[in-house]
């Protein structure tokens, strides 16, 4: 049944009114909520603010490296140390290695551009920092609704955004209501801030409806895959931050790794692959597993135990790929717009800062008696902020690196180290990631080694330790515009790339009795990384929100 059918039979939906509704309980959304309530307290005015979060709890779906620049969180909550923020492991040492298959070359610290240096930053679990931000928001009176995904944008008669509706509960696989059916709820607001993270489901719709991407470069993405390990205490160096480039990726494939030493004898190890890669046989997950076999990495992990796993797409386009940030009734904030600084491999500080800027614009608009118009003060304040300066200096990073590791490294070194990012030229992204795959007939198949179950693993055992769970009796949230495309186009032309780019074994080609192929979608495995929505060559796969509370539950990630 369609939404309209359900409303006709079971409606109308209940509704709640707020001054500001925030979609997404990550660092951007929670920072916006906190800033709104801070301003309301300073002015001694009432302000209704709510946050919708699709995860089962705040932090459940948050995955990042992460090394945090504390500049933005210090602006938001100056006494964060006294309030117990989980930023406790300061960076003690930076290492950067270029890897070959069996060797490595270390870059001296003095030769690293400033954007690769992390003195004054903290090795964190962004999931735990987000949980702490949630506590700060609730203490200020923000209403937070975990397990309630925003599934639909609501519009006023004049076309401006009115708010959002949460997803229905109790729809069966056949699309019909079950005995547990409940209609979603409408949340109306004067302004709605969309903070869904990279490749936001509703953000995509807003980009299309309001033509927000006109004049912007294509957005480009990476897939980040991460594991949490407990290692031998004798190998543990709290605060050590290591990045690598090179092997196992080919020169023309953008990507690299991170290995951060946290507290409690734990390290996080991860791998990022740019989704503009061309060979359909490439598997980002398998490249990550192969990377861990390098002597420099094996030496750290061997004898340890893998604790958790996750994956998430990240925006990498930078300043030139930012869309228009505002539209009548709302704004895109954080990675829903694409504020991550790829040259620093950091986005949490940008999410917090843009959350604050959007909140300040929304607060002033509400106090002025405005509603449902464009929050033009938000992009204006961004353009005069330190964040804009930072992103402007790094605006060519991804473009240079997409030209190959060697040329990219030289040019980034010249721009960032010698010239401090102050260059008169600007490079542009020309293509979307989904346009980049070559036909399989033009590419060399890649044979990956089998996992050993100690250092390297398969995808199903990895998904298991991501604590991913979905209600089984619900429609698949990975939808196909045309069910014939996976076999007739993706399998025949590209050798079924969705079976490789997905880090959770969601997509599986199996043989029918007559020997033909068909695609099976194991939606219950989905870790909500959004890679399929980005990389599918014909954009036939569309990720939509599953029933609330579904997906991963990342501890300490």
Residue positions per predicted region:
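Predominantly flavin-linked oxidoreductase catalytic cores and closely associated redox partners
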Residues: 45, 127, 131-132, 136-299, ...
């Amino acid at each position: 049944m369609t939404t309209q059918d359900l409303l006709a039979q079971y409606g109308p939906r209940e509704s709640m009114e707020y001054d500001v509704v925030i979609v997404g309980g990550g660092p951007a959304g929670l920072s916006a909520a906190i800033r709104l309530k801070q301003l309301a307290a300073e002015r001694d005015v009432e302000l209704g603010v709510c946050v919708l979060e699709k995860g089962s709890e705040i932090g459940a779906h948050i995955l990042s490296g992460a090394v945090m620049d504390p500049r933005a969180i210090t602006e938001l909550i100056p006494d964060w140390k006294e309030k117990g923020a989980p930023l406790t492991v300061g960076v003690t040492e930076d290492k950067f290695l270029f890897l070959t298959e069996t060797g490595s070359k270390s870059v001296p610290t003095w030769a690293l551009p400033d954007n690769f240096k992390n003195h004054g930053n903290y090795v964190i679990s962004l999931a735990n920092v987000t949980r702490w931000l949630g506590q700060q928001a609730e203490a200020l009176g923000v209403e937070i609704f975990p397990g309630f995904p925003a599934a639909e944008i609501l519009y006023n008669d004049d076309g401006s955004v009115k708010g959002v509706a949460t997803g229905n509960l109790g729809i069966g696989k056949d699309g019909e209501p079950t005995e547990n059916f409940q209609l979603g709820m409408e949340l109306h607001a004067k302004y709605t801030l969309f903070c869904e993270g990279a490749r936001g489901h509703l953000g995509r719709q807003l980009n299309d409806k309001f033509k927000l991407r006109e004049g912007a470069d294509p957005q480009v993405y990476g897939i980040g895959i991460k594991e949490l390990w407990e290692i031998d205490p004798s190998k543990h160096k709290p605060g050590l931050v290591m990045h690598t480039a090179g092997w196992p990726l080919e020169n023309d494939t953008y990507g690299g790794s991170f290995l951060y030493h946290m507290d409690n004898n734990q390290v996080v190890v991860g791998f990022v692959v740019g989704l503009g890669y061309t060979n359909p046989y490439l598997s980002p997950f398998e490249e990550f597993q192969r990377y861990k076999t390098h002597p420099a990495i094996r030496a750290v992990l061997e004898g340890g135990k893998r604790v958790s796993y996750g994956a998430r797409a990240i925006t990498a386009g930078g300043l030139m790929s930012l869309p228009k940030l505002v539209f009548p009734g709302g704004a895109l904030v954080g990675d829903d717009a694409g504020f991550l600084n790829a040259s620093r491999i950091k986005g949490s500080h940008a999410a917090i800062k843009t959350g604050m800027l959007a909140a300040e614009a929304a607060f002033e608009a509400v106090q002025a008696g405005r509603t449902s118009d464009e929050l033009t003060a938000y992009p204006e304040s961004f353009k005069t902020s330190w964040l804009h300066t930072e992103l402007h200096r790094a605006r060519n990073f991804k473009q240079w690196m997409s030209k190959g590791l060697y040329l990219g490294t030289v040019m980034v070194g010249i721009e960032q180290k010698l010239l401090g990012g102050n260059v008169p030229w600007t490079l542009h992204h020309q293509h979307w990631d989904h346009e980049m795959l070559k036909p399989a007939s033009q590419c060399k198949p890649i044979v990956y080694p089998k996992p050993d179950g100690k250092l390297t693993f398969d995808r199903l055992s990895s998904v298991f330790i991501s604590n991913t769970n979905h209600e089984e009796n619900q429609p698949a949230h990975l939808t196909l515009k045309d069910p014939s495309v996976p076999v007739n186009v993706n399998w025949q032309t590209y050798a079924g790339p969705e079976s490789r780019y997905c880090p959770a074994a969601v997509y599986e080609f199996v043989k029918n009795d007559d020997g033909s192929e068909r695609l099976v979608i194991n939606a219950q495995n989905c870790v909500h990384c959004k890679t399929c929505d980005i990389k599918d060559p014909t954009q036939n796969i569309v990720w939509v929100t599953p029933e609330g509370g579904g997906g991963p539950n990342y501890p300490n990630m």
